[in-house]
Amino acid sequence: MAAARGRRDGAGRAKIRSIHPMSRLFRDVEGGLLCPRGSVVCIGAFDGLHLGHRALVRHTVARARALGLPAVALSFEPLPREFFAAANPPPRLLLPRGRVEGLLGLGVDHLGLLRFDAAFAAMPAEAFVRQVLVGRLGAREVWIGPEFRFGHRRGGDLALLQAMGAELGFSAAQIAPVEAAGGRVSSTRIREALRAGDFATAAALLGRPYTIGGRVVRGRQLGRTLGYPTANLRFPKVPALSGIYATWVHGVGERPWPSVSSFGTRPTVEGVEPLLEAHLFDFAGDLYGRHIEVEFVARLRDEEKFPDLPALIRQMHLDAQQARHILSESERLRATA
């Protein structure tokens, strides 16, 4: 997917053109009526696109199809919690590209990935309803998840939507909470599971295995020097992981490729920026520039600083052996499931 390109209007405000070839993705809150016949809209952060998010989006799409109207999902970039905690943002469950592709893949006709900046944060909830939901999208129905809030100081909720809808000609409702793995599905629970290395619970809440995708970039090639060449992924947003993992890499061949991966700053070699490094077992190809997905199966250990490179190499041998064993057992269980 091509990167968004920005330009400035006469007032110096950033204007973002659609970055989807079918013009299904928009970033601006200004502009003409996008859905002249009306629309069915859902709103949320959608970080992770977990089972609760998917239930909300699928319900919105079903309602839109029943009414013969376009389905619209509204979200934000950066996420509001990232904007308000810029110095220490919560870790991402799903990177921007994955969120866009996931939402469009659920069948929405338009996706609003609205730029969350200081001006947007200061917009009163009432103005958001009038300007965006009605003025931009012609909303006929608005759907939200449990406890969703919007607008300046989180002043908008379901009651406000319903009151303004009665005035402006749309209905508003929320879907029921989704339960899985012994409790309510939430992004917080998923982050806790990932931090604990509990990928089974994370997968149960997400409705799929936890993966991180990105384009393979050139690193310092230290892994090759140490006998463990890696496919390196950098991220604009820090995922909710840190440590050494048994992983599958998708996008290399017809089947997932067994691998051992490290996410962190590589303290033994004085690394600084977070980097995901995936060593694919018995692989000899060139992956530079290719988009791959790394599926996390098990957490092996914390990232740590070793006294010297020989000590690091010895541990890498142990990590690789453990990852091979875990993945072999995982593959056996899949085959008999």
Question: What kind of feature is each model-predicted range?
Answer:
Residues 219-337:
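Phosphate/ribose-recognition catalytic cores of enzymes acting on nucleotide-derived substrates
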